[in-house]
Amino acid sequence: MALSYYSLLLLLLAVWAPALTLVMAGDPDILTDYVIPANGNPMNITGDFFTFTGFRKVFNTSSAPEPNSFTVTKATMAEFPALNGQSVSYATLVFPPSTVNPPHTHPRSAELLLVVDGALSVGFIDTTNKLYTQDLAAGDMFVFPKGMVHFQFNSGNQPAMALSAFGSAAPGVVPVPVTVFGTGIDDAVLAKSFKTDVPTILKLKANLTPPNKS
């Protein structure tokens, strides 16, 4: 998916996202400039420690085939240790046509989504079970409040890309479908909860894989 010059300019706007996410941050404050990894030597810290290059593969579309399914590339504390204590992280989301980021939550942070290329339909549900939806174009932003179940969907026939900023170095993710149907909850419990029968539950579980515990 080739990014237009306009789309690349939108990425520059994303540098302001950390300022907002810091306001919403929930990570514990630190008493040092930054957190050195366990058993790390402060004398060995260089600019490389504060640099993350994992998004290059996302934007270097000329050398990599377009994915055929929804793909997320994270830059959280796990992938970018320098974020530890900084209360900020990013993720890139790539949506081929007719793909979805299924309903999920981030228990430790709000999410600020910037559509970089293409268009997305998004929404979240609040604690009163009210659904809020919006159709977004390139350049639009949408905030998903902390802990709310939300989704993003590319219903069009063109690919889409988005950048998400979080107010935590480890926002966490709880995918609703696989968490409910792929973690070993008794089938009878699920059948009664969804007012259906066990064979229907088994059909729902057949195509789901357990969530990643990393």
Swiss-Prot record:
Protein name from the UniProt record: Putative germin-like protein 9-2
Residue ranges of every copy of the Cupin type-1 domain listed in the record: 56-202
Database matches in Gene3D superfamilies: Jelly Rolls
Chief localization: secreted
Glycosylation sites: N44, N60
GO cellular component terms, A-Z: apoplast
Highest taxon, organism lineage: Eukaryota
